[in-house]
């Protein structure tokens, strides 16, 4: 098995060092924005009064919608440079959406015996995110006219 750093080395060499650094910068820049948006949503929407983390749900649903909007744009022939795609989809949307926090919240609900809340969380996040991605694609079609 090849060591992970050797895979990175081969990737750098294949893309050319300049292209790789631009890609890393694009993903990193988008991730900084996406992670801060997710954090802000949590501060704004989460409270200790209820067991549902509305900030996490809002992050996943809005990220799904944004990915759908971007995919709709690309499917209609819209073009961004590869670096802008990495910034928007991999960086921003990838850091905005959060499978790990969602998973932790579901497992915590299960451990507390709140099975209906766990199932509701799974349905809201998974079905909701898929629905919002489809809605994002549809939204782009409506906006494009």
Q: Predicted segment positions?
A:
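Membrane-interface helix-loop junctions in multi-pass transporters/channels
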Residues: 2-145
């Amino acid at each position: 098995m090849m060591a992970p750093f050797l895979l990175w080395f081969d990737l750098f060499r294949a893309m050319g060092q300049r292209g790789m650094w631009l890609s890393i910068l694009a993903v990193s820049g988008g991730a900084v924005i996406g992670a801060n948006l997710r954090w802000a949503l949590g501060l704004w929407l989460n409270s200790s009064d209820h067991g549902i983390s509305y900030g996490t749900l809002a992050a996943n649903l809005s990220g799904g919608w944004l990915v759908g909007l971007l995919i709709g744009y690309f499917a209609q022939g819209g073009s961004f440079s590869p670096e802008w795609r990495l910034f928007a989809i991999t960086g921003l949307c990838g850091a905005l959406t959060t499978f790990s926090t969602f998973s932790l919240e579901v497992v915590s609900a299960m451990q507390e015996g709140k099975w209906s809340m766990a199932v509701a969380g799974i349905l809201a996040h998974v079905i909701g995110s898929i629905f919002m991605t489809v809605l994002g694609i549809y939204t782009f079609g409506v906006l494009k006219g």
